[in-house]
Amino acid sequence: MDIKQVTETIAMIEEQNFDVRTITMGISLLDCIDSNIEKAAEKVYHKIVTKAGKLVQVGDDISAELGIPIVNKRVSVTPISIIGAATDATDYVPLAKALDRAAKEIGVNFIGGFSALVQKGYQKGDEILINSIPKALAETDFVCSSVNIGSTKSGINMTAVRDMGRIIKETSAASEMGPAKLVVFANAVEDNPFMAGAFHGVGEADVVINVGVSGPGVVKRALEKVRGQSFDVVAETVKKTAFKITRIGQLVGSLASERLGVKFGIVDLSLAPTPAVGDSVARVLEEMGLETIGTHGTTAALALLNDQVKKGGVMACNQVGGLSGAFIPVSEDEGMIAAVQEGALNLEKLEAMTAICSVGLDMIAIPANTPDTTIAAMIADEAAIGVINQKTTAVRIIPKGKEGDMIEFGGLLGYAPVMPVNKKSSADFIARGGQIPAPIHSFKN
């Protein structure tokens, strides 16, 4: 793959807000384990600074050479619950602060991995980490947190679901931005380059580079040229465009891993929007013929988009991974925000769309007085969709303000109207706790 190919590709896609959304370095912290939490925190800081010290500079150099914006440089680490479990500490905020200090030192804009994997139950470090989340996110600037509460192989840990409903409310009370940096997953992946859900899986190499690309504006421009034509043409157009976008991600990842002297992991084939006009997944779906996203046909349009992005992207790179699909975060997509304000898009339709897309109920503002049991029930519903359909689903919701308010996050996180939530109670359902067993079709052996 040479530079000529890249310049041709840029010309073909007419630079419609195309960017490489993130270069994320995954770093294993297993060799930083220590029974003393202060010593462990110091080891964590030094390993991140040593391994990722040149990440931002290399990203900037590649961006300048190729003329392609590389918006974010980020780091993901081994789930901190594993590192903390070796200590006798009763909270893991010192480890979160070490991550934050390292992020500031190397200049990345997020560091992910203040995480726990509890799909089948709690180990020693898991509950401590989960209870540390509100304070950890309030007292750091760049740390992101995630908790995996279910998987197709394990079922859904409903005790953890109940706890996370409470933790999201506590996180929202403790800080303005906290809930925007906290994701609850089912079927979380170990090589996700996107925040806030990135962590470095224990099955990964010591250090890897993962890349996430973004080009909804590019796909929309391509579809404008085939307006009114059949879905066969639409599918082929999306597929070819996704190939071009992903090819650039492959090149950027290859160059970054080569210059940093670390393994190249994956390209995530996700279409990630921003609040900027012309960078919206919602507008891509509307270009297929929907008056407004949220109307009937939205889920079918999303299914076509998601599938063809994967088909085009797979051909373009050596290894694909991460979440790979279309993101539908409300606050980060100008078209989604408009549809919510018009009343065309509600929580129930968003939930239906999550059966198709990457992730799930993402960056959605709900009233601050929503009970934690209702939030837990939303998590349970999303987890059920993921577990039954063998896909990643997640919840990143922000309980702030009252219905109709506009919540401002700023930057890539955008702004979101506070959406109405079903007021009937799920409290007795959530109070049961325990485990929803794995589905019958999970038994593959």
Curated annotation (Swiss-Prot):
It holds the Pfam family DUF711. Signal peptide: none annotated. It comes from the Bacteria. Homodimer. HAMAP family: UPF0210. Belongs to the UPF0210 family. This is UPF0210 protein SMU_73. It comes from Streptococcus mutans serotype c (strain ATCC 700610 / UA159).
